[in-house]
């Protein structure tokens, strides 16, 4: 299990990490907020591509909303085989553990952010 946070839409880091899974043992990534959901108009396409790569490399990504994520992507409607965008207050049962994932607050600077920049 690997925890990461605050990637703010830099999905290439996850892609490169998954490519390094040479053993093909299952790896679970837990993104603990500020994933970057909804800031780029290409977000859905980015997830489709990333999901294909994660599946190929036997990596599953679980993401909880941060204050710099669009909450609408974490309502349970947006999930892929290897990417799970989890609702606030999810109890994730993984690798024999139960983890409470709370989710972030509403970002006070969301309207000032610029697509593909911040």
Where would I find each of the regions flagged by the language model?
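Conserved P-loop NTPase mechanochemical-coupling segment
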Residues: 1
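Core catalytic region of metal-dependent phosphoesterases/phosphodiesterases
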Residues: 4, 9-94
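Active-site-proximal loop/helix segment associated with metal-binding centers of metalloenzymes
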Residues: 97-118
């Amino acid at each position: 299990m690997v925890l990461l946070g605050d990637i703010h839409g830099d999905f290439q880091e996850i892609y490169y990490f998954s490519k390094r899974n040479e053993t093909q043992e299952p790896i679970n990534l837990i993104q603990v907020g500020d994933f970057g959901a909804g800031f780029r108009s290409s977000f859905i396409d980015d997830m489709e591509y990333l999901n294909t790569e994660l599946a190929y490399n036997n990596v599953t990504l679980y993401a909880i909303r941060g204050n710099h994520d669009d909450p609408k992507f974490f309502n349970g409607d947006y999930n892929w085989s290897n990417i799970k965008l989890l609702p606030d207050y999810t109890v994730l049962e993984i690798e024999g553990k139960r983890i409470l994932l709370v989710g972030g607050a509403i970002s006070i600077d969301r309207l000032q952010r610029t697509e593909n920049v911040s």
